[in-house]
Amino acid sequence: MVELKGTHDTICAIATPVGEGGIGIIKISGPEATAIARRLFMRSGSGSGLESHRLYHGWIKDPVTGQSLDEVLVGTMAAPHTYTREDVVEINCHSGFAVLNRILELVLREGARLADPGEFTRRAFLNGRIDLSQAEAVIEVIRSRSEQGLLLANRLLRGALGEKVRSWREGLLELQSRIEATIDFEDDLDEDALCAVSDRARFVTRLDGELIPALSAALESAERSRALREGVSLVLAGKPNVGKSSLLNALVGRDRAIVTPFPGTTRDVVEDTFLLSGILVRVLDTAGLRHDPDEIESFGIARTIQSLEEADIVLCVMDRSRPLSAEDDAVVEAVASRPFVIVLNKEDLPPAISTGKIRERYGENVPIMAISALRPPDVERLRDFLNQRFLRLPLEQSGSAIVPNLRQRGCIEKALQAMIRARDLISGGGFWELASTELRTARNELDSVLGWNGDDALLDRIFSDFCIGK
């Protein structure tokens, strides 16, 4: 296990956002945590002891001046049953810049040092309470912006990914040990024993029938369920003045974009978010696509094209009260490579085009929704349609989905490729030594998911994303 420099000292940090509020928390972890608390905290009532995992009322006082700073609640937690597996103290005081920083100064003066970003969680990892995939899940929980994202992050925090990776790793270790036995003891084994440990078909069956499908399925599931973790991007595209901005405002439930009767009001991409079945939807209102934009509008259209290329879903918005035009054709052509829905807006006005005309022009299987962005029931129908058509599958899988982050997916992908190379070597009669090397590579990649490979630079990069106090 990697050991971080300074892990035997005592660290402290403000664990809550600094500002005016009801409660602020200062966290202390390390061998001197409880001793520091005893020197600063005067318990109310007749008692003086601080039992583990109990909360005590009292006052923080400067031991030098005797000045009382704040009325607090102090909790002490003895190792190893703590977040870091070290002695931990949490001082719950009033939240204000002056009081939090003054108490922190006293804790530092009594011998603690200021924690680095993520150092409490890093100590939890280094002390074996969590693996690296769980440590990374902490930041996922903090940054979750949707219910589904939170549920997935919580699943990782509870160790679901680490459990799978450890089982794959054990399977690899067993295969590799048999191969090493074949290599090391080939001259010492009789023919029957040698056949038993070096049966190539058995190795291939184990890889093809168990390990390779398991990793492949995990990666495929992660890709299918990506929307649950990362959300989806929904781009509103169309020619000018078809009601894209009105639709954006209706979807997010507030006046986010400027709406006027004049074409070309939206000159740049306007972005906001809303939740759909617990999934974060990032909706982008884009500049209208037309043949003769002015110079400023051209920049907005360039960004529109980029947004379309990156979109998960496109709503191709058309004005039902106006005849189809070459500009509508250009919009459909621009979005044809992405999952899209034609939204016939302004259904509250006399129609100039029909769904039949749309299908005749753009194809029988083109999905179409006729709505008015000004009517809430219509917008709700559109939400339901998007939910059923694009989000139903990931939501059905959400109960068991384990979605690793980008780094973890990269490690699993590399492990899978190494297993495939090992399989091909074994089935093709290649050298056992080369197959063993590939299996070792696969195991090292899985070790990286768990943080078992002693990579300090990797740990520094991961924990630098954390806030101080976590």
Swiss-Prot record:
Cofactor remark from the record: Binds 1 potassium ion per subunit.
Organism for this UniProt entry: Syntrophobacter fumaroxidans (strain DSM 10017 / MPOB)
Keyword rRNA-binding among UniProt keywords: no
Domain TrmE-type G: 231-391
Upper lineage: Bacteria, Pseudomonadati, Thermodesulfobacteriota, Syntrophobacteria, Syntrophobacterales
Subcellular location: Cytoplasm
GO molecular function: GTP binding; GTPase activity; metal ion binding
Gene3D superfamilies named among the record's database cross-references: P-loop containing nucleotide triphosphate hydrolases (3.40.50.300), Probable tRNA modification gtpase trme, domain 1 (3.30.1360.120), tRNA modification GTPase MnmE domain 2 (1.20.120.430)
Alphabetical list of NCBIfam families matching this protein: mnmE_trmE_thdF (TIGR00450), small_GTP (TIGR00231)
One annotated Gene Ontology cellular component of this protein: cytosol
EC numbers, comma separated: 3.6.-.-
Residues bound to (6S)-5-formyl-5,6,7,8-tetrahydrofolate: K27, E90, R129, K470
Pfam families named in the record: MMR_HSR1, MnmE_helical, TrmE_N
GO process annotations (BP): tRNA methylation; tRNA wobble uridine modification
Keywords linked to the UniProt accession: Cytoplasm, GTP-binding, Hydrolase, Magnesium, Metal-binding, Nucleotide-binding, Potassium, tRNA processing
Family indicated by similarity: Belongs to the TRAFAC class TrmE-Era-EngA-EngB-Septin-like GTPase superfamily. TrmE GTPase family.
Main location, first listed in the record: cytoplasm
Names of the cofactor(s): K(+)
Protein name per the record: tRNA modification GTPase MnmE
Function in brief: Exhibits a very high intrinsic GTPase hydrolysis rate. Involved in the addition of a carboxymethylaminomethyl (cmnm) group at the wobble position (U34) of certain tRNAs, forming tRNA-cmnm(5)s(2)U34.
Assembly and interaction partners: Homodimer. Heterotetramer of two MnmE and two MnmG subunits.
Enzyme class: hydrolase
UniProt: Mg(2+) binding residues: S245, T266
Binding site for GTP: 241-246, 260-266, 285-288
